[in-house]
Design a protein with these regions (language model features):
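Jelly-roll (double-stranded beta-helix
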Residues: 2-123
Length: 123
């Protein structure tokens, strides 16, 4: 999972997927049985800041895959929104890990949130 906070990343991979990852766009690439990829900062005069998370699948020998989703509208509502899920949450990118939900948000000043109940919680 890649989530850009500031700047832009260009993604290319051996499956023919290519695109620009920008703030508010969540991207998932599953290596599966094998994939090559590159991610490059598009702006030479500006740093890019991003979060990248590896979530091991709960199934072996899956095919490589790629998905991206613009979540800006959900983030503007405040609170937390599911960015990626193996549990079928609406609007989330699908991941091959039934026990995982990755939440994110753009909190407003003084806004607080409650972490949703889950079998495993990492903050």
């Amino acid at each position: 999972m890649t989530w850009v906070l500031d700047g832009e990343l260009e993604h290319k991979d051996s499956e023919g997927n290519a695109g620009i990852i920008y703030p508010g766009l969540a991207q998932r690439m599953s290596a599966g049985t094998g994939i090559w990829h590159s991610e490059m900062n598009l702006q030479k005069d500006k740093d890019v800041h991003f979060i990248q998370m590896w979530v091991p699948p709960d199934t072996e020998r899956i095919n490589p895959s790629y998905e991206q989703l613009d979540i800006n509208r959900d983030l503007e509502k405040g609170g937390l929104t599911p960015i990626a899920s193996g549990r079928g949450h609406e609007a989330a990118i699908s991941i091959k890990q039934r026990g995982a939900v990755l939440w994110g948000g753009r909190l407003k000043p003084a806004e607080s949130v409650q972490i949703p109940d889950a079998p495993y919680v990492h903050v």
